[in-house]
Amino acid sequence: MVNKPNPKAYRPEDYPYERGLAFLLRDNYRYFSRHLKIHLERHGSSLPQWYFLRVLAGQDGLSQKELSDRVGVLAPGTVTALNKLQSKGWVERQPHPSDKRKSNVYLTKKGRRLVRSLLPEAIKSNNIALEILTEEQMEQLRELLILLRAGMKKKSIDGDFP
């Protein structure tokens, strides 16, 4: 069981930044993304754009709102990203069948080809971790991260989390 710190007794020397969970997650994200970023840039894409392409590759035809939620980007950021993706010919928007005010987003053939060509590099980035952790440890880590995300999301929605 992890001891919860006493907020009245916080001292920086007792809580080194490099042991902080958010710091560790961010630092690992940087290492994972650095490898993929090089390959994305060669194809004229970026990490933020890749997230949208990757989500759509898993489930095409999502609304902009659904995409925002899944990628974790606010609506204005989603609109900007989709405009760029559309200008590159990687996605297209089609009117929602029952609500003409909304649109659904689809990968184009060109977008699908891009995802297929970049997916091996994304998998390589993930597999680097398998050189460090066993498959069992990787699965445990995934499960813990999923649990953490769900808990953090719930706290955020409930207003208990800034």
Pin down the residues of each PLM region.
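Short capping segments at the starts of secondary-structure elements
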Residues: 59-63
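N-terminal leader segment of winged-helix/HTH proteins
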Residues: 1-43
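Alpha-helical transmembrane segments and membrane-interface helix-loop junctions
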Residues: 64, 104, 144-162
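Short alpha-helical "packing" element that flanks the helix-turn-helix/winged-helix DNA-binding module
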Residues: 52-53
